[in-house]
A protein has these predicted regions:
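Histone-fold and other basic nucleic-acid-binding segments
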Residues: 1-66
């Protein structure tokens, strides 16, 4: 997988923890979890769109799928 860039994820971790260092392993672990969760949500959203007779996933599908 590994499609999300690490830098923004590291910034998110640092912002959440204050003045703390973040290991590359921690950043990679969070990236992997976020990508996995994103795929799960996207798959559920696609099912919702198909069920509604649409070929386009809308923001409302994503919100319902989360």
């Amino acid at each position: 997988m590994a499609e999300l860039p690490l830098a923004p994820i590291e910034r998110i971790i640092r912002r959440s923890g204050g003045e703390i260092r973040v290991s590359e392993d921690a950043t990679i672990a969070l990236r992997d979890i976020l990508e996995e969760k994103a795929v799960e949500i996207a798959e559920r959203a696609a099912k919702l769109a198909r069920h509604a007779g649409r070929k386009t996933i809308k923001a409302s599908d994503i919100k319902l799928a989360k």
